[in-house]
């Protein structure tokens, strides 16, 4: 038995085709469409109570799926009055998109329907269009201001040309694309085209986009020659184009002798290059050579100051075996991962060089510079803690999200390099756009580090930054010796007295676990006081204070 559901009375909405307010995209038309649809809902309810009639034919109903839910969502969106909120018509099994799209609409989500096409005319105000998981075989002309387009998992064989000049994100994976547009929007940060039928790419692909952009071409039938040409171009010195993910996967650079790789960074410095030839058999030398080769392919290679910093590090490591050993150790395994891991590892090597300079007495005669380097170390430690919490928070929020902690850590370092005067780290990174670190995150981190520094930098230098104690032993041996004597003396009677008092205060006398916990707290407090007083005395004697 079939119960009739009257078709929605959409016809009268467009009785006067000459009227501007009757255009499918106009607010008036959309309003009357919603009104008519609402009347149809009421009519359907009354009809079902009083009569049983034949079901409508396919011609009598303008769409399949759940049109009434689409009506309700559209009405709710209009009533909310916030044009920045997306109109969400996803998961409704709609076949055509018959709802008139109101002018002024900025964000539209029609994911997971059964759409075979989209309206020929989309609102000119549209900024974001989500239309994945449908049956689209073509796309209409796209609004010039469109910034984000997601049409993954459809049946597209090509993309419209030209693409909007403002487009920043394009997801077109899992379609049947046989070619990419010749002209790529210059602002595009992400082009996802994996799992298509691409056999070639535009010749100018690598020159149309900059180093911040990424293109995913995995799982396409690209000939080996095409892929090899792309890889060769991306690994050329000075390459400043996009990062491209290819079907062949990561490409292993041929391993070169250490001195040959070093020579690329030290042009004309034959003496230093010859010295590096003698380190080829040291443990970790081969990994370090490969690391230096990969470092030439990073986004920072085009920066003159960066290249000079690498060269300085190489010259310093010639005469400092311990520093060289740290370089070799840190390079182990670093080249097996993405480009940004290479950059983050180099940042660590720069930190090792800075600490080596301090410990070797380079700043013994310039305590002001020494303390500034101490602030840099404090800020880096604070940023590490913030990055770690960001990673944990992102994973708690979405356990299935692909969070790469390397990108998170490096994002904070590069984005706060100037603000926090972290001048020794690399200035750029490749994949900032997938780090999940927002401008708001960066601003909060800067404020947090400044607050932590204001409260805790003095204690950090006095008790936790080992280079300071080594410097003090050299420049103020008497003060350092007196400090050691004070510490030894305080760890006797003062420590025992304070511990007994605290145990009694908490009713835990004789409790071994409490002794360990309270004992550690008291020892730290004693060290803070004595080391802090000594540090302040040494600095005051040289006209400095924190």
Curated annotation (Swiss-Prot):
Q: Where in the cell is it found?
A: Secreted; Host cytoplasm
Where is the stretch described as Interaction with target proteins?
1-248
Gene3D superfamilies in alphabetical order: 1.20.58.90, Ribonuclease Inhibitor (3.80.10.10), Shigella T3SS effector IpaH defines (1.20.58.360), Shigella T3SS effector IpaH domain (1.20.1270.130)
Please give the positions of the paired cysteines in each disulfide bond.
Answer: none
Record-linked InterPro entries: LRR-bact_E3_ubiq_ligases, LRR_dom_sf, NEL_dom
NEL domain residues are 257-546
Segments for region (Disordered): 1-70
LRR repeat residues: 104-125, 126-144, 145-166, 167-186, 187-208
Q: Name one GO biological process term.
A: protein ubiquitination
The UniProt entry, under PROSITE patterns, shows: NEL
Comp. bias (Basic and acidic residues): 58-67
Q: Name one GO cellular component term.
A: host cell cytoplasm
PTM annotation, UniProt: Ubiquitinated in the presence of host E1 ubiquitin-activating enzyme, E2 ubiquitin-conjugating enzyme and ubiquitin.
Q: What is its EC number?
A: 2.3.2.-
Q: Please report a single Pfam family linked to this protein.
A: NEL
Low complexity bias locations: 22-48
- Out of the domains of life, which is the source? Bacteria
Mainly resides where?
secreted
Chain intervals for the UniProt region annotation (Linker): 249-256
Q: What is known of its domains?
A: The LRR (leucine-rich repeat) domain forms a slightly curved solenoid and may mediate interaction with target proteins.
Please identify the protein, giving its name as recorded. Answer: Probable E3 ubiquitin-protein ligase NGR_a03640
Q: What is the lineage of its organism?
A: Bacteria, Pseudomonadati, Pseudomonadota, Alphaproteobacteria, Hyphomicrobiales
């Amino acid at each position: 038995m079939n119960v009739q559901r009257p078709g929605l009375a959409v016809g009268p909405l467009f009785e006067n085709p000459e009227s501007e307010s009757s255009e499918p995209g106009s607010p008036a038309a959309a309003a009357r469409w919603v009104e008519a649809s609402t009347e149809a809902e009421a009519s359907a309810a009354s009809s079902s109570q009083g009569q049983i009639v034949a079901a409508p034919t396919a011609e009598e109903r303008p769409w399949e799926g759940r049109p009434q839910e689409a009506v309700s969502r559209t009405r709710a969106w209009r009533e909310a009055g916030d044009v920045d909120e997306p109109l969400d018509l996803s998961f409704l099994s709609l076949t055509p998109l018959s709802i008139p799209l109101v002018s002024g609409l900025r964000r539209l989500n029609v994911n997971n329907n059964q759409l075979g096409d989209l309206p020929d005319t989309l609102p000119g105000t549209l900024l974001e269009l989500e239309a994945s998981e449908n049956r689209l075989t073509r796309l209409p002309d796209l609004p010039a201001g469109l910034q984000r387009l997601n049409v993954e998992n459809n049946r597209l064989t090509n993309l419209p040309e030209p693409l909007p000049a403002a487009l920043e994100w394009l997801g077109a994976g899992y379609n049947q694309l046989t070619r990419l547009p010749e002209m790529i929007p210059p602002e595009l940060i992400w082009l996802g085209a994996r799992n298509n039928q691409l056999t070639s790419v535009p010749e100018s692909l690598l020159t149309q986009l900059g180093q911040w952009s990424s293109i995913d071409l995995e799982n396409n039938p690209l000939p080996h020659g095409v892929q090899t040409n792309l890889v060769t171009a991306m690994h050329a010195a000075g390459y400043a184009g996009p990062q491209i993910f290819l079907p062949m996967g990561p490409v292993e650079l041929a391993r070169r002798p250490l001195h040959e790789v070093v020579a690329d960074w030290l042009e004309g410095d034959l003496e230093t290059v010859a010295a590096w030839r003698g380190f080829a058999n040291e443990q970790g030398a081969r990994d370090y050579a490969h690391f230096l080769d990969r470092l030439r392919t990073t986004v920072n290679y085009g920066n003159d100051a960066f290249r000079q910093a690498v060269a300085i590090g190489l010259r310093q490591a010639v005469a400092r075996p311990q520093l060289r050993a740290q370089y070799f150790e840190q390079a182990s395994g670093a080249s097996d991962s993405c480009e940004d891991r290479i950059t983050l590892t180099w940042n660590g090597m720069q930190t090792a060089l800075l600490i080596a300079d301090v410990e070797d007495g380079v700043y013994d005669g310039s305590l002001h510079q020494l303390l500034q380097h101490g602030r840099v170390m404090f800020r880096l430690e604070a940023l590490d803690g913030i990055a770690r919490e960001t990673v944990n928070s992102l994973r708690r929020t979405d356990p299935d999200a692909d969070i790469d902690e390397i990108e998170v850590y490096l994002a904070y370092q590069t984005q706060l390099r100037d603000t926090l005067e972290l001048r020794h780290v690399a200035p750029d990174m490749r994949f900032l756009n997938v780090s999940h670190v927002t401008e708001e995150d960066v601003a909060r981190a800067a404020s947090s580090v400044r607050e932590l520094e204001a409260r805790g930098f003095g204690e950090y230098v006095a008790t936790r930054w080992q280079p300071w104690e080594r410097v003090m032993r050299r420049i103020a041996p008497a003060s350092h010796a007196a400090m050691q004597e004070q510490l030894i003396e305080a760890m006797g009677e003062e420590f025992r007295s304070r511990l007994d008092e605290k145990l009694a205060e908490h009713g835990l006398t004789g409790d071994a676990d409490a002794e360990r916990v309270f004992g550690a707290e008291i020892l730290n407090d004693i060290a803070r006081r004595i080391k802090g007083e000594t540090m302040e005395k040494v600095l005051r004697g040289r006209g400095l204070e924190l």
